[in-house]
Amino acid sequence: MNAPESPLVAPQLTQTSPSGIDVPVRVGADAVDPSRIGAPGEFPFTRGIFPDGYRGRLWTIRQYSGFGTAEESNERYRFLLDQGQTGLSVALDLPTQCGYDPIDPMARPEIGKVGVSLSNLSEAEILFKGIDLAAISTSFTINGTAAIVYAMYLAVADKLGVPRAKLTGTIQNDILKEYVARGTWIFPVRPSMRLIADTILFSNDATPRFNPISIAGAHVRDAGATAAEEMAYTLANGLAYVDDLKRRGGDIEKFAKRLSFFFYVHMDFFDEVAKLRAGRRLWARLMKERYAVADPKAQHFRFGVVCGGSSLVAAQPYNNIVRVAVETMAAVMGGAQSIFTCAFDEAFQIPTEFSAEIAVRTQQMIAYESGIARTVDPLGGSYFVEQHTDRMEASIEGIMREIDEYGGVVKAIEDGWLQARLAERALERKMRIDTGETVIVGQNHFRREDQKNEVGEVFRLDPNAANRVLEKYQRIRDTRDAAAVAKNLARLGKAAADERENLMPYLIDCCHAYATVGEMVATLKEQWGEFQEPVGL
Amino acid sequence: MKATTQDAATPLRGKRIVVAKPGLDGHDIGAKVIALALRDAGAEVIYTGLRKTPEHIARVAVDEGVDAVGLSILSGSHRELVAQVVQALKALDAGDIKVFVGGTIPADDVAALESLGVRGIYTSEQPLQEVVEKLARELG
């Protein structure tokens, strides 16, 4: 575990990719089996789900943003939309994500820190003020309280007179990976799965253009999983949701069209491209072969991508701009439907307007200057890329089999098996960085003792934001119709006890009555209890 | 981890350490990696799991008779939460238990945390061996 002897000595290029896949020096034409590849827009969609790639429609440029109060975040959203961003991505603070009202002692230190505080409908009204919800799509990184935030979005659309059917956007709503990494779980696994099925089944009818789930590998990836493991865990989780929805009587030809996915892209270019191409092909095959899905649209693997995350480092932070550019190219070559590029300072602070703008410009340069978006799947047919895609797919399938053999992903999570496995993997990754085997330029290789690690402009949260949130919270509690709140919460509690009910209409009623996120969560906890975290290492 | 003697490989042998996640931050992989590394270095590690109150963490530290508490915070709430844990330890007459912090800690906040009595601040880029060695020196 010693540091590299000289940080300026060039390391050897390895023969194995970070996903553990053998990478030959030379790959010949015999490595490619054209029958496995297919054409763009055709099964098995190795080359993308659309025949015209990005010519028909560019990916959505969607930057994750939100902090402090709804007023401040609304201002940042308008700034980003003015810069040519084409969708919103709402970052919510931890109290909102974990289901605590701002006044709760657990919530107080966290108000507005990692996202905006959204405790009730009155805050949503401020957050989306002056933004045309029928014209833009809005994505929410929300899981434990996803059903509640979705209900709040519908309620605010109702208030603004926007027809629900016109709403587009996404709620992450993927609780399984929260138990493994990221940690904003609230309820035990089974009632959480019910809540997710409720949102998907309700959304398919009420908001048919909305993605009621974004099954995410991003967080396990950032926590230590390889690209192959990220895809394998995500597909396994996806299948668990599919099985649950079928059990609830959902029509797979219908709900499968609105399942979407979400990944991190890190720095190993071909692992990433291969991961995305292999995942798309594997999902289509699973839909068609395992579930006999006939409609090609219900076989489509649509996904968003984040570039950056834990691949960004504090050492020489401006280098991160280049990392994000490389990663964005991999996301485009992999055929992403939406891309979020991290700002170069995002690994350690909320981005400033300066760094946030560079992140948007990076996508625009790749979209409109580089030319790589002109041709669909420009790497398709490359001897190496097709071979690496095949090997990646085999590796993903192998990991999925291991999970199956353990007893399925739900059991693996409830037992803490997957969590422990991920922690071991994270330790291995850290050791490889410490020894210099994994190269991070400017950190463990090619660094100088006197190098500059300052980020330049430092973002400062307004220290009074939390107090303003608390004042607004108290005001709404004092002015709302308390009897209507109590009545609607009671109806919600009763419906939660009955598995045949879909909870969405009850949650929307609660939101309209200005019930708070904390009140709705407390009502559901009374029925379902809380998740008991397995903490064994 | 290569080492010439047993002691060098396990410099934290005999030490008991709580690794804790105060507040609502769910990013626990750093805490788990540190917990595994400290365990491999010979320490007995008690990992609390997510979303623990400062009072709970202090209570566990006292009940388990630990030498040190490591707090992992990536949500930006480190100043408030560390102050609360330090306070909670003092309230239990356990102000002598040493407090360490890891996570996303801006350089500007280091002095503020040290003035609360924090004995070491670690970020994800620090090699684990360095973390272990520093900790071993601090805990004597």
Residue positions per predicted region:
Chain A
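Flexible, glycine-rich loop/tail regions that form catalytic "lids" or insertion modules at the edges
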Residues: 6-33, 43-45, 94, 353, ...
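A short glycine/serine-rich beta->alpha loop
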Residues: 136-142, 225-226, 268, 310-316, ...
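Generic secondary-structure signature for well-ordered alpha-helical cores
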Residues: 86, 129-133, 155-163, 197-209, ...
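Active-site capping/gating regions of soluble enzymes
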Residues: 216, 232-241, 260-442
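Catalytic alpha/beta active-site cores
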Residues: 1-266, 271, 290-293, 297-304, ...
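Short Asp/Glu-rich motifs
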Residues: 99-100, 176, 349-350, 422, ...
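Conserved active-site and cofactor/substrate-binding residues in soluble primary-metabolism enzymes
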Residues: 40, 71-75, 83, 118-122, ...
